[in-house]
Protein backbone atom coordinates (compact mmCIF):
# COMPACT_ATOMS: atom_id res chain seq x y z
CA UNK A 1 0.00 0.00 0.00
CA UNK A 2 1.39 3.43 -0.88
CA UNK A 3 2.67 5.34 2.16
CA UNK A 4 0.63 8.43 1.27
CA UNK A 5 -2.57 6.44 1.87
CA UNK A 6 -1.62 5.49 5.42
CA UNK A 7 -1.47 7.70 8.52
CA UNK A 8 2.05 7.80 9.90
CA UNK A 9 1.20 9.31 13.30
CA UNK A 10 -1.78 9.95 15.54
CA UNK A 11 -1.40 13.63 14.68
CA UNK A 12 -1.84 12.84 10.97
CA UNK A 13 -4.99 10.88 11.79
CA UNK A 14 -6.45 13.73 13.84
CA UNK A 15 -5.74 16.16 10.99
CA UNK A 16 -7.60 13.81 8.67
CA UNK A 17 -10.64 14.08 10.91
CA UNK A 18 -10.63 17.87 10.66
CA UNK A 19 -11.22 17.59 6.93
CA UNK A 20 -14.20 15.30 7.55
CA UNK A 21 -15.84 17.80 9.89
CA UNK A 22 -16.30 20.20 6.97
CA UNK A 23 -18.12 17.62 4.84
CA UNK A 24 -21.81 16.78 5.02
CA UNK A 25 -22.70 13.56 6.81
CA UNK A 26 -22.79 10.51 4.56
CA UNK A 27 -21.84 6.86 4.80
CA UNK A 28 -18.48 7.47 3.09
CA UNK A 29 -17.43 10.22 5.53
CA UNK A 30 -18.60 8.08 8.46
CA UNK A 31 -16.51 5.16 7.18
CA UNK A 32 -13.51 7.48 6.90
CA UNK A 33 -13.97 8.77 10.47
CA UNK A 34 -14.42 5.22 11.73
CA UNK A 35 -11.20 4.16 9.98
CA UNK A 36 -9.38 6.97 11.81
CA UNK A 37 -10.86 5.70 15.07
CA UNK A 38 -9.71 2.16 14.24
CA UNK A 39 -6.22 3.42 13.43
CA UNK A 40 -5.97 5.25 16.76
CA UNK A 41 -7.19 2.14 18.57
CA UNK A 42 -4.61 0.00 16.77
CA UNK A 43 -1.76 2.22 17.97
CA UNK A 44 -3.26 2.25 21.49
CA UNK A 45 -4.26 5.91 21.54
CA UNK A 46 -7.48 4.85 23.25
CA UNK A 47 -8.42 8.25 24.68
CA UNK A 48 -8.17 9.89 21.27
CA UNK A 49 -10.06 6.98 19.69
CA UNK A 50 -12.81 7.36 22.29
CA UNK A 51 -13.12 11.10 21.65
CA UNK A 52 -13.43 10.47 17.92
CA UNK A 53 -15.92 7.74 18.79
CA UNK A 54 -18.27 10.42 20.09
CA UNK A 55 -18.28 12.03 16.66
CA UNK A 56 -18.61 8.65 14.92
CA UNK A 57 -21.50 7.54 17.12
CA UNK A 58 -23.40 10.82 16.81
CA UNK A 59 -22.96 10.80 13.03
CA UNK A 60 -24.19 7.20 12.88
CA UNK A 61 -27.30 8.26 14.81
CA UNK A 62 -27.87 11.23 12.49
CA UNK A 63 -27.65 8.90 9.49
CA UNK A 64 -30.10 6.49 11.13
CA UNK A 65 -27.72 3.54 11.25
CA UNK A 66 -29.21 2.44 14.58
CA UNK A 67 -32.54 1.81 12.82
CA UNK A 68 -33.33 -1.20 10.65
CA UNK A 69 -32.52 -0.16 7.07
CA UNK A 70 -34.78 -2.87 5.61
CA UNK A 71 -37.86 -0.83 6.53
CA UNK A 72 -36.91 1.83 3.97
CA UNK A 73 -37.47 1.10 0.30
CA UNK A 74 -34.84 3.64 -0.80
CA UNK A 75 -31.93 1.37 0.21
CA UNK A 76 -30.62 -1.34 -2.06
CA UNK A 77 -29.71 -4.73 -0.64
CA UNK A 78 -26.03 -3.67 -0.71
CA UNK A 79 -26.85 -0.41 1.11
CA UNK A 80 -28.69 -2.38 3.79
CA UNK A 81 -25.71 -4.71 4.25
CA UNK A 82 -23.20 -1.85 4.46
CA UNK A 83 -25.34 0.10 6.93
CA UNK A 84 -25.76 -2.95 9.17
CA UNK A 85 -22.09 -3.89 9.09
CA UNK A 86 -20.93 -0.34 9.70
CA UNK A 87 -23.30 0.13 12.63
CA UNK A 88 -22.30 -3.11 14.34
CA UNK A 89 -18.61 -2.35 13.78
CA UNK A 90 -19.10 1.03 15.46
CA UNK A 91 -21.08 -0.65 18.25
CA UNK A 92 -18.37 -3.26 18.93
CA UNK A 93 -15.53 -0.74 18.96
CA UNK A 94 -17.53 1.56 21.22
CA UNK A 95 -18.09 -1.32 23.67
CA UNK A 96 -14.39 -2.18 23.63
CA UNK A 97 -13.26 1.40 24.24
CA UNK A 98 -15.77 2.10 27.01
CA UNK A 99 -14.72 -1.11 28.76
CA UNK A 100 -11.01 -0.34 28.35
CA UNK A 101 -11.34 3.26 29.56
CA UNK A 102 -14.08 2.79 32.15
CA UNK A 103 -16.36 5.44 30.67
CA UNK A 104 -20.16 5.27 30.19
CA UNK A 105 -21.67 3.77 27.06
CA UNK A 106 -22.82 6.14 24.35
CA UNK A 107 -24.94 3.58 22.47
CA UNK A 108 -27.82 2.17 24.51
CA UNK A 109 -29.26 -1.18 23.45
CA UNK A 110 -32.80 0.16 23.94
CA UNK A 111 -32.23 2.66 21.12
CA UNK A 112 -31.26 0.00 18.54
CA UNK A 113 -33.51 -2.00 16.25
CA UNK A 114 -31.11 -2.86 13.42
CA UNK A 115 -30.58 -6.59 12.87
CA UNK A 116 -27.18 -8.20 13.00
CA UNK A 117 -25.58 -8.41 9.55
CA UNK A 118 -26.12 -11.82 8.06
CA UNK A 119 -28.01 -13.02 11.14
CA UNK A 120 -31.17 -13.74 9.18
CA UNK A 121 -31.88 -15.02 5.70
CA UNK A 122 -35.16 -13.67 4.39
CA UNK A 123 -37.19 -14.96 1.49
CA UNK A 124 -38.30 -11.58 0.14
CA UNK A 125 -37.69 -7.93 0.77
CA UNK A 126 -41.16 -7.54 2.33
CA UNK A 127 -40.42 -10.30 4.87
CA UNK A 128 -37.11 -8.58 5.65
CA UNK A 129 -38.98 -5.36 6.39
CA UNK A 130 -41.53 -7.12 8.58
CA UNK A 131 -39.01 -9.09 10.63
CA UNK A 132 -36.78 -6.10 11.39
CA UNK A 133 -39.23 -3.22 11.60
CA UNK A 134 -41.80 -5.13 13.62
CA UNK A 135 -39.23 -5.94 16.27
CA UNK A 136 -38.93 -2.98 18.64
CA UNK A 137 -35.93 -4.39 20.44
CA UNK A 138 -32.45 -5.60 19.66
CA UNK A 139 -32.55 -8.91 17.79
CA UNK A 140 -30.61 -11.54 19.67
CA UNK A 141 -29.48 -14.93 18.44
CA UNK A 142 -28.56 -17.94 20.55
Residue map of PLM features:
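Extended, leucine-rich alpha-helical cores of fungal transcription factors
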Residues: 1-111, 125-142
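Flexible glycine/proline-rich, aromatic-decorated loop/lid segments
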Residues: 110-121
Amino acid sequence: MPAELVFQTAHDAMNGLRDLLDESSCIASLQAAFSIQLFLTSILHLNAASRIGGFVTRTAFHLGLHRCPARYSCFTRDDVAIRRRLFWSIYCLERYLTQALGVPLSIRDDDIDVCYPGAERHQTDSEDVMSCAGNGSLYRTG
